[in-house]
């Protein structure tokens, strides 16, 4: 839930009926408790004022105008001398009208109803906890059949003590023959349970720790059995094991969060504050109302009817009561999620009513559009492009975006360095884009991380921190390895950039949100910063080299420069020797001077490593020199031996691309080792 002072956290979950009552109930100065909505009315058609105990009641939700009660009396808000603080005639407190944005009410349901999110949504949490098929639970909730209620230490007519056996509908026709009407009602209320009340009884009797222990024991037994050889049976066992794992995780979550399973069955239905479901008067005197008001009215109408059947008339047939309970359940289902059970409810113009789920979910819902998607200061947006020369923790920020985001910091820097006398002069320098501006901007950005976010933010890697650097152009540059965490592509995707202002936010960005600290997937633990797409193609081109071996390369006339434009004469053709280099720096220098190509084969001097030499491999060629030394040429390496056959040096056959990749890997390993040595 939200802290009332700092507003730093939000938790969404199940609440107890006591908590709902505590949110909605208010004690007036005269000791009267208000909060329950009992009437389905909104405004009086003559006075245009909210109906008492209705959906817009001022006693429950507060006054429409600050300090003015329903009678029209006025009191100064917060004045201790003014007494009393509420109107004794209408019972409305003299408080600020903004209370109608957060003051809730509740409807006391005449029968328990299941929360449709936890029954019908997949996976069904109620079905998982009770380990029963969803269709049977739906039939029980909507009064299609019943089960025998066990009664401890009492004799039962059905003699099914301690068991929950579902009965077919024949009990409605066979069992009543043994009773009078009054006797059958007593028997049904005592030994038969149906509707959401039956679900609530079963959930209340659950021991979550026993569920975890038994589920683990069954999962272990299924794992020890091994495959049966029957593909259908093996799939069935696999599905059962997956279900047991989900059931254990669900039970652990209930224990960890101190939530009782029976809270998934509602006894009190919360009523939203009136300002969140308004009625607006438009031109011509017509009224526009939120769809939720109509759905609330439907619930109250049916609930009041059920209350009358249960309290005023003792001779009401049980079938009629069960039918009315089903109607109340369906009305609450429509309020929470219209259309989840089939055809949605529509108005007179054949328009589907927007339920509570429709209001909060989706791209246009309350969270994504109003709370998460709203415009904020110190933020910008632009297209992302690949920045292969960037470090993993850096991003390229265009100058136009950077100067706008860090404008206040640049102004402070200009004034501190006495380059501007006041804010107006500093803004003038920024508009004229003087060279000193970019120098100060560089200094400001060096120690200030930024947050990059790509919508939709489906997991925590959807927003990460980077160290910004200035780049030319109008696009944000990103390292290609962070693409997968954002689920982004460099084909026109846009990302938002935010500047953390407080020291706490900057510390959190540096310690938890930097991209080089989020290399593993938080869901499964696998590496998420892995080469994909362009990087794989680049690595392939870098390390492909020539496909021809040393022999084919030697006598292939295609090695001659400009061979397409010259006449090939095999008799006058001379082989161009593959160059020798003492170290990788000389090889890369030759490539930069365009003396060799990226995939040109070359000989690179290597350390005396016996692992390079194949013991049983015969040399392809042996070259002797005048001093007695000779070269043994193999497929991928070359050995220089002395007169005494001692190894003087070894050369390996490689390319500039392989050398570049090796140097990058070696540098990364050395950096990792240095970091580990610092930690120890």
UniProtKB/Swiss-Prot annotation:
Binding site for Zn(2+): 69, 71, 87, 90
Co-factor binding details: Binds 1 Mg(2+) ion per subunit. Binds 1 Zn(2+) ion per subunit.
The protein's enzyme class: transferase
One Pfam family it belongs to: RNA_pol_Rpb1_1
Cofactor dependence: Mg(2+); Zn(2+)
Keywords: Chloroplast, DNA-directed RNA polymerase, Magnesium, Metal-binding, Nucleotidyltransferase, Plastid, Transcription, Transferase, Zinc
Keyword Chloroplast: yes
Stored InterPro entries: DNA-dir_RpoC_beta_prime (IPR045867), RNA_pol_asu (IPR000722), RNA_pol_N (IPR006592), RNA_pol_Rpb1_1 (IPR007080), RNA_pol_Rpb1_3_sf (IPR042102), RNA_pol_Rpb1_clamp_domain (IPR044893), RNApol_RpoC1 (IPR034678)
Residue numbers binding Mg(2+): 489, 491, 493
SUPFAM superfamilies per UniProt: beta and beta-prime subunits of DNA dependent RNA-polymerase (SSF64484)
One GO-annotated biological process of the protein: DNA-templated transcription
GO CC annotations on file: chloroplast; DNA-directed RNA polymerase complex; mitochondrion
Example of a GO MF term: magnesium ion binding
EC number: 2.7.7.6
Catalyzed chemical reaction(s): RNA(n) + a ribonucleoside 5'-triphosphate = RNA(n+1) + diphosphate
Protein's cellular compartments: Plastid, Chloroplast
Family label: Belongs to the RNA polymerase beta' chain family. RpoC1 subfamily.
Main function: DNA-dependent RNA polymerase catalyzes the transcription of DNA into RNA using the four ribonucleoside triphosphates as substrates.
Subunit field text: In plastids the minimal PEP RNA polymerase catalytic core is composed of four subunits: alpha, beta, beta', and beta''. When a (nuclear-encoded) sigma factor is associated with the core the holoenzyme is formed, which can initiate transcription.
Protein name: DNA-directed RNA polymerase subunit beta'
Species per Swiss-Prot/TrEMBL record: Carica papaya (Papaya)
């Amino acid at each position: 839930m939200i802290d009332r002072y700092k507003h730093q956290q939000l938790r969404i979950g199940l609440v107890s009926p006591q908590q709902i009552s505590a949110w909605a109930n208010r004690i007036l100065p005269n000791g009267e408790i208000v909060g329950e909505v009992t009437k389905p009315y909104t405004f009086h058609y003559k006075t245009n004022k909210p109906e008492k105990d209705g959906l817009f009641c001022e006693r429950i939700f507060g006054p429409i105008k600050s300090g003015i009660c329903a009678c029209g009396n006025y009191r100064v808000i917060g004045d201790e001398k003014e007494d009393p603080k509420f109107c004794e005639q209408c019972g409305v407190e003299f408080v600020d009208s903004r209370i109608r944005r957060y003051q809730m009410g509740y409807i006391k349901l005449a029968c328990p109803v299941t929360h449709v999110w936890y029954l019908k949504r997949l996976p069904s949490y109620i079905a998982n906890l009770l380990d029963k098929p969803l269709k049977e639970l739906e039939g029980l909730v909507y009064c299609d059949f019943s089960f025998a209620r066990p009664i401890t230490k009492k004799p039962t007519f059905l003699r099914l003590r301690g068991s929950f056996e579902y009965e077919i509908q024949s009990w409605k026709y066979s069992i009543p023959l043994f009773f009078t009407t009054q006797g059958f009602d007593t028997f049904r209320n005592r030994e038969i349970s149906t509707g959401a009340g039956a679900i609530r009884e079963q959930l209340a009797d659950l021991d979550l720790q026993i569920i975890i222990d038994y589920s683990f024991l069954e999962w272990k037994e299924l794992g020890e059995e091994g495959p049966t050889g029957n593909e259908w049976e093996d799939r069935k066992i696999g599905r059962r094991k997956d279900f047991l794992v989900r059931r254990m995780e669900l039970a652990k979550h209930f224990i960890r969060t101190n939530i009782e399973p029976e809270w998934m069955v509602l006894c009190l239905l919360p009523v939203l504050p009136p300002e969140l479901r308004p009625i607006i008067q438009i031109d011509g005197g017509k009224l526009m109302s939120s769809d939720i008001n109509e759905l609330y009215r439907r619930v109250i109408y049916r609930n009041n009817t059920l209350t009358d059947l249960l309290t005023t008339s003792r001779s009401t047939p049980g079938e009629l009561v069960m039918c009315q309970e089903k109607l109340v359940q369906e009305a609450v289902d429509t309020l929470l999620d219209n259309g989840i059970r089939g055809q949605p409810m529509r108005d007179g113009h054949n328009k589907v009513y927007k339920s509570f789920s429709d209001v909060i979910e989706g791209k246009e819902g309350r969270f994504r559009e109003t709370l998460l998607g709203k415009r904020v200061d110190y933020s910008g947006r632009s297209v992302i492009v690949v920045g292969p020369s960037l470090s993993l923790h850096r991003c390229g920020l265009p100058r136009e975006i950077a100067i706008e985001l860090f404008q206040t910091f640049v102004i402070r820097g200009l004034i501190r360095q006495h380059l501007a006398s006041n804010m107006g002069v500093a803004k003038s320098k920024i508009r004229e884009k003087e060279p000193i501006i970019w120098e100060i901007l560089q200094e400001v950005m060096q120690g200030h991380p930024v947050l990059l976010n790509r919508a939709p933010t489906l997991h925590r890697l959807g927003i990460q921190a980077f160290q910004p650097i200035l780049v030319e152009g109008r696009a944000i540059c990103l390292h290609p390895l962070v693409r997968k965490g954002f689920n982004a592509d460099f084909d026109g995707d846009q990302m938002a950039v935010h500047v953390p202002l407080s020291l706490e936010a900057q510390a959190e960005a540096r310690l938890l949100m930097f991209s080089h600290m989020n290399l593993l997937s938080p869901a499964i633990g696998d590496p998420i910063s892995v080469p994909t797409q362009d990087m794989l193609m680049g690595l392939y081109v870098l390390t492909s080299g020539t496909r021809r071996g040393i022999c084919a390369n030697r006598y292939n006339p295609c090695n001659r420069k400009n061979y397409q434009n010259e006449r090939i004469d095999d008799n006058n053709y001379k082989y161009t020797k593959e160059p020798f280099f003492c170290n990788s720096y000389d090889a890369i220098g030759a490539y930069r001077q365009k003396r060799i190509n990226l995939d040109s084969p070359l000989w690179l001097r290597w350390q005396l490593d016996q692992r390079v030499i194949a013991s049983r491999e015969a040399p392809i060629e042996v070259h002797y020199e005048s001093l007695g030394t000779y070269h043994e040429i193999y497929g991928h390496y070359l050995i220089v031996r002395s007169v005494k056959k001692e190894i003087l040096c070894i050369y390996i056959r490689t390319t500039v691309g392989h050398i570049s990749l090796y140097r990058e890997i070696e540098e990364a390993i050395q950096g990792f080792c240095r970091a580990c040595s610092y930690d120890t």
